[in-house]
């Protein structure tokens, strides 16, 4: 076991939703590039709004609904089905699924944690900024705050391997892979 330092690298995992994706969204809101009241399909035209089972009632899903987990999107996508259908990894296939999947509830009537909300926000950030979320966060957030060891793919910035396992289980090990949130 080694002592932790200011250069120790942790996996942010789902903390990246609030510490990066939400903050990057707010940066673009502050710059007038995104409006919280806008429908998601303003930025992702194929994104479908909520429609009641009988088709008589409709409700727009807004950017604000994604940030507050009130969109009605499911928590996760059917990973195995999506890999079989589109291959893995396939961000375009995932967004096709998110854009058309069944909504769990009418927007703004309930709250349910959803990774799909923040994957959708990632896509909005990338379309509006013309950069990947990783590039935008690094340039407009991490570097501005002097967070030199913060990144979505830390091995690119820190090849020293100064990593902390997030678990001390016998099976725990460092796993490098694609990020989705």
Spans of features found by a protein language model:
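Short, surface-exposed loop or secondary-structure junction motifs
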Residues: 51-181
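Short, glycine/proline-biased beta-turn/loop segments that scaffold the active-site neighborhood
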Residues: 36-52, 144-145
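Generic hydrophobic/packing signal
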Residues: 23-29, 44, 67-74
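Active-site SXXK
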Residues: 11-37, 118-126
